[in-house]
Structures are given as structure tokens and as C-alpha cells.
Amino acid sequence: MEAVDLLANVSVTGLLLFWGDCEFFVSEILYDENLSENAQETRKVLLNNFRVVHVRNPQEFPFPSDYKEEDGSDDNRSSSLGRSAQSDDASLASDNQDDGIPEYFGDIPPVAAQDIVNVLKQGYLEKKRKDHSFFGSEWQKRWCVLNNLVFYYFGSDKDKQQKGSFYISDYSVQLVTNLRKDSRKTSCFEFFAPGRRPFQFTAGSPQEAKEWVDQIKIVLRDLSSTVIPVDDEEEEEEEEETYDDIEGEGGPPLPQPLSGTWGRGGDTGAADEEDEDIYEVLPEESPDSADGSMERNNKPEYANYYQGLWDCSADEPDELPFQRGDLIYIISKEYNIYGWWVGELNGAVGIVPKDFLHPAYIL
């Protein structure tokens, strides 16, 4: 029995000596070395982990007599040792450790938080770690950014590359209440898919979580459809409606139809004012834009008319400028997933930002 106790004491003593050597090497030896940026970050993480162990286990791992905390620019580090909550100390190390190896899925390249384009929603959320250790908290504060294809998460809104990212088209999203047991359990949502790792987040409030989920669902719906949606009921109504019916809605004046087409401005043909039925006219060639003529179905396509919400100037040659209130015909939604549609205004054709438009007619 005495031999066992002796071995146990030797093991503990050896562990403490080894711990002290490791801490001395990281804090003192590496201090004078010319380390790369990644190595400096790793050293900071290790120093912070040593400090967390000292704070949480002062009897077994007391602070060295000559301990001093280094000044640094790492926002995750504490400026004093006066923190008493263990969860706070754990979160310091956790913030540095989580996603230590950046998680990139598919062909998503590294990108700075400020350089993401087509941002639809962004803000701070708490992300649940894939696995958490002795040093780690289960949740970490992350700057999250949603665009029309990818969900990114960063350590902060100033980070030069993401800690992780994934294509949202591979997932579904839902609000959940079983991820936490505290007062924020109703502020959680998750991305999930069969056979894939889930991604789980906590927002600042239930309302904020719902806003995230609603926005993500809108993007998922856009990704699943690249054509202009038309309900069956709307289609039936379009077959029965006449110009007089539409004009009764009180919307903007309707463009006169071309021969063989509907909903296009021009002077090559007009409907008989006394004829209340929709009739077909044999299609004939008519000049259009410089790109050539475009065919339309022989029925009204008022669902494809949108009105400008704000003035929009063209930054590129392929963009279509328009003013607030302009009536724009949407030719296609081929680039819907990028936030752009193809529109026509006064014979000019170009891409327009869909967020600057809203339906012109209530059908």
C-alpha cells in the first residue's frame, strides 16, 4: 500500500514538474523567439489555457511566484485576474480554441468579414461547439454573416478570414428549444440535414432567432427556384381577367400590348376598347432592343411587372439603371441566387437588384 501511495505521489509530482516546464517554455523561452503570426496566436492560446487552469484549480496549480500577465491585443484575453466566474474563464480559452482549424466546406475560399458581398443578414450569435473540452465552454460568441449562398461565422466582425462556413442549400433550418436549459432556450435555431453535421446557434432573443430563421428560409426558397413563381389560382385568374379588370385595381397605367404579345409598351397594335374578352393575335415580328426580339406568351404577364422602390444607378455596363416608381418588366430570374434579375425598361435590357423592386400589381 505504501508503495502505491509513493508511486502516486511521484506521478503527481512529476506531472506538476512537467506542467511547470511546459508553462515556462511557452511563457519565457518562446517570448524571445521570432514567431510567425500563427505561432504567436497559438502561444497566446496556450498561455490563456495555463491561466484558466490556475484560476480554476488554485490548490493543485497555484500561480508561479513571478507570474505576470502579458499585455496583448487579443480581445479575448482578460485584463486582470479579478474574474471569479468559472464560465467566464472557460469562455476565454474557448473563444480561442473553437474551430482552431478553420472549417471550410466545398470550395468556399477564406474571406474577410468586411469583404463578403450580397450580405442579407449579419450579427453576433452564440455558436454551439462541435465538441468542448476541459478548457472550453459549450457556446462561443461568433460574428455570423448570411449571404445568398453561404453562412459564415467569424471570431469578430474585424476578422480577416472565417472560422467556418457552409453552403446553406445543403441544409434546412428550424427554431429549437432543446439546446439549452437556461433562459435563452427559446432563442435557439439550427441548420440540419440527414448525414451532415448540424450547426446550432443562439440569438439574443426569441424574436431575433425568428428573424434569422425567416431570412434563411427566404434564401433557401430562392435557391430552390430560379423561375418567377406563379400560383395556380393566379394563373386561372390571369386567363379570365381583362384590361378593364386590371385597370380597376388603381395601380400604375398599364403598357399597351404589342401585336401577338401582352404587357409591352409600343405603338404597333392595341386591344379593341369595346372588346371585353381576351383574344389571340397572330404573332408577327416587331423591332425590339439591340439584342433582338423577345417572344412573350399570348396572355397578360402582370406578375412579371415590378416597380422600383429606390433610385438605382448602373455601376457596370450590364446593369439596368432605373428611378423610384419605374415600371420594370422582369424577363427572367436566371441570376436569382446572386440577388439579381434580368429586367427591361423602355427597350433597354439589363440586370437589376431584386431587393430594389416590389410587385407592381396585386393579382
Swiss-Prot record:
Coiled-coil stretches are none
Instruction: Show the segment(s) annotated as Disordered.
Output: 62-94, 227-273
Q: Does the keyword Isomerase apply?
A: no
Pfam families with a match to the protein in the record: PH, SH3_9
Q: Which family does it belong to?
A: Belongs to the SKAP family.
Function recorded in the entry: Positively regulates T-cell receptor signaling. Required for optimal conjugation between T-cells and antigen-presenting cells.
Name assigned to this protein: Src kinase-associated phosphoprotein 1
Q: Please name the source species.
A: Takifugu rubripes
